[in-house]
Every structure is written in structure tokens, then in C-alpha cells.
């Protein structure tokens, strides 16, 4: 493992890794924001629920 750090500068490698992870996190968040289900800024679109009222038939007609 120590030979790897002789090939690469540790400071540059860590800065590069942090930059890559930050860009990846931004990309994932923007992809989620572009979907309707996971867009937490605008909220989920609430569609009106369709209900049907059924009146029970009365078999005991007088």
C-alpha cells in the first residue's frame, strides 16, 4: 500500500477524491430533483382522489 502513495501525492489524491464525491453527490441530488416523486422542493403533486358514494339499497321497502 505504501508504494501507491509513492506514485501519487496524497494531498492531490485526497483533494481529487473529495471533489469527485462532491460532484457525484450534486449529480445524484439534481437527478432526484428532476423526478416528480423525489422532488422535495416543490412537493409531491396531490391528485384529487376519486371516490364513489354508493347508497345501500333498502330491501325493506314499506
UniProtKB/Swiss-Prot annotation:
Cytoplasmic compartment segments: 1-12
GO terms of molecular function: bacteriochlorophyll binding; electron transporter, transferring electrons within the cyclic electron transport pathway of photosynthesis activity; metal ion binding
Entry's localization field: Cell inner membrane
Pfam families, sorted: LHC (PF00556)
A GO term from the CC aspect: plasma membrane
Sites of N-formylmethionine modification: 1
Taxon lineage: Bacteria, Pseudomonadati, Pseudomonadota, Alphaproteobacteria, Rhodospirillales
Record's subunit section: The core complex is formed by different alpha and beta chains, binding bacteriochlorophyll molecules, and arranged most probably in tetrameric structures disposed around the reaction center. The non-pigmented gamma chains may constitute additional components.
Pro-piece positions: 53-62
Residues noted as binding a bacteriochlorophyll in the record, renumbered to the chain: 29
Residue intervals on the Periplasmic side: 34-52
Gene Ontology BP terms: photosynthesis, light reaction
Membrane topology, as annotated: Single-pass type II membrane protein
Family to which this protein belongs: Belongs to the antenna complex alpha subunit family.
Main subcellular location: membrane
Spans through the membrane: 13-33
Ribonucleoprotein listed as a keyword: no
Alphabetical UniProt keywords: Antenna complex, Bacteriochlorophyll, Cell inner membrane, Cell membrane, Chlorophyll, Chromophore, Formylation, Light-harvesting polypeptide, Magnesium, Membrane, Metal-binding, Transmembrane, Transmembrane helix
Keyword Nucleus on entry: no
Function (record text): Antenna complexes are light-harvesting systems, which transfer the excitation energy to the reaction centers.
Organism: Rhodospirillum rubrum
Protein name (database record): Light-harvesting protein B-870 alpha chain
Amino acid at each position: 500500500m505504501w508504494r501507491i502513495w509513492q506514485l501519487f501525492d496524497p494531498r492531490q489524491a485526497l483533494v481529487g477524491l473529495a471533489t469527485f464525491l462532491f460532484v457525484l453527490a450534486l449529480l445524484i441530488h439534481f437527478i432526484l430533483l428532476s423526478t416528480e416523486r423525489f422532488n422535495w422542493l416543490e412537493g409531491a403533486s396531490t391528485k384529487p382522489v376519486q371516490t364513489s358514494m354508493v347508497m345501500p339499497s333498502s330491501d325493506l321497502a314499506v
